[in-house]
């Protein structure tokens, strides 16, 4: 066996480069982070050949002292930390002193820098790990680093690179993340000499729109919440904006882009009730916390981190997002800037347990209780009142033809409302009788009567319900409603499904079980062996869901009681679906974790079906329930429950004013 020998510095640098510089995007990240740490307010990036042929980064930062310029290309040489205590409280983007040395060992690197009090710049070159002597050069205050012919001396590594287009895409994505994390810095990018983008110093709100897109901005909810020394802010997309890709998911911890399973798990748990199928949410989240509360020295790329109190982080992220999403109802969506209520006003809502270190990338499959945290402080990251800006209208110009004034529209609505109130007493009484007989009303209570007629005076905007009044039922599927200045279409099954689901969740949380209603005559049905086994194993669990079944022998089961609020649902289909869910889930712990999924299945059975004719009182009762139900903008599967056509959009359809 050969004798042990110390490796030469050049080989050590190339080994380190294998960890730090996997591709051009990693080299770009290291260089740009140095510019950020230097206090630059403008950073210009040029890429040739996807960053393989050339990466050039210029900044207007503080520059490097002429006596230190050679030292900057040595391993473990840095100005950012000096003691172990500095490492535990690191606030800079870089601190390891490996980035430039690693890049210099696998490229032809040129470093030119000038400080404000210097008469000229100083330049040094490195090739194959060998440094040239510093020379004077012309350069404004700041630093320019050029890394040419990446991996020219390690052909095996270069073979693993993808096409120039692919490598460029990784570089552009990396630069966008850095620009998003530092909106106060101006960024520009050129590709093969052609400008790609130029971002001025902006507010966070403007930078999110520039990087993530205006479509995300108009479909997002602003959040700004805190808990002790932790602060969470940014924007999350409404569930209807969810996509099948994860390209619009950004997590930043102390302005550093990270891939953290704790934060990602909390986000997924917050969205679990409102996402459809395999769709994923879009979000831009910033978490600020003391540097000593997070360890960024886990991996050389610094995208993996470790929180000192991961449970507190999980709580803050989950409860903040859950609160924001719960408020998306009846066109009353606002940003969550009332942070003091976030961790205390969510009754009975608990996230799933955090993933362990060995968890896989699929983080959907767990749920458990967490204690609530302390009442947090309130700050708004966007410098506004916290209100979400209304979605801008992009259709036709304002109509020029005569239309009803707002006062005339209200008067017309009042006339309708008064007629509706006087002529529908019989319908209301019939619907009450129907509810008593079948229990199939979307709401548990009829519309409350008021002593003040709706036509007494012109109502103000605040007196009109957000979803307006029902006008008619379309095709046995949709409810047509008129609001203050718009026409609404409501999917009655999807809406009733969400209302029933939230009611059942609330009843389970308050009482520990669903109230059941015994059937006068039990309903029997033929069951499979798996369904019979599920009944034998989980009879007590079924009782908690308001279902009472008994085994009659011969693979025959009898349904003796069903949840009271599900009315005249198909009890056999309901029982078979719930038994099927229990048979698939397995252990009692997993059943508890999948409770909401079982409730969602049950609510679907108890909701009004397409084709059923509703009376006006029933339709209006459903609208009022929607206005008071969390997450009522989406059904349990993430589909929208209603859409709005404004007066301007209706005018545009008929070319009014064009």
Swiss-Prot record:
NCBIfam families: mutl, PRK00095.1-2. This is DNA mismatch repair protein MutL. Belongs to the DNA mismatch repair MutL/HexB family. This protein is involved in the repair of mismatches in DNA. It is required for dam-dependent methyl-directed DNA mismatch repair. May act as a 'molecular matchmaker', a protein that promotes the formation of a stable complex between two or more DNA-binding proteins in an ATP-dependent manner without itself being part of a final effector complex. GO terms for cellular component: mismatch repair complex. One of its GO terms (biological process) is mismatch repair. Pfam families: DNA_mis_repair, HATPase_c_3, MutL_C. Residues 114-137, 369-391 are annotated as: Disordered. Residues 114-130 have a biased composition (Basic and acidic residues). Transmembrane segments: none annotated. SUPFAM superfamilies: ATPase domain of HSP90 chaperone/DNA topoisomerase II/histidine kinase (SSF55874), DNA mismatch repair protein MutL (SSF118116), Ribosomal protein S5 domain 2-like (SSF54211). GO terms for molecular function: ATP binding; ATP hydrolysis activity; ATP-dependent DNA damage sensor activity; mismatched DNA binding. Keywords: DNA damage, DNA repair. The keyword DNA repair applies.
